[in-house]
Amino acid sequence: MDKLLVKIENDSDFMNIVGDILENKMVQQMKNYRQHFNTSCFDHCLEVSYCSFIICKKLHLDYVSMARAALLHDLFLYDWRGSKKKLHLKRLHAFIHPYIALQNAQKICNINEKEQDIILKHMWPVTFFQFPKYRESFIITITDKLSSLNSFRKYILKKEEKSFLKYQKKLDS
């Protein structure tokens, strides 16, 4: 994330589009919640947003709506592990959090129709009947999954490194 963070901070187009959202208190709270493995919800959303922004820009799609919606797509602000019981949710997190994220996003900025679709449909194909209406909505379904896989990859590499160092320490003894 460090290399990507430098890229993001140096991309004035991206920062001009999402800067106001990044400074929002509610968005900053995403740093307090773990999304996948050791990745915060904030870092995950930032990675998805920037990667989606780049793809949409190259494909001459609506990269502004994409960057903003992708940054807000997981703005649910709770620990989702075991959340259905703990929070008395009517449905599983995978199915309900896009609606919670949209409600929270609407509290902090105006959300256009495309941004709404991007946020609500980002879990497709898990939410099978919520088919993406726009190309941007489909793109986030891919970048979101790739970001999750990237978090998993980093987690496994870190575990392997710890295991290797522990083994190496035993050999040196």
Regions found by a protein language model. Name each.
Residues M1-S173:
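Metal-dependent phosphohydrolase cores
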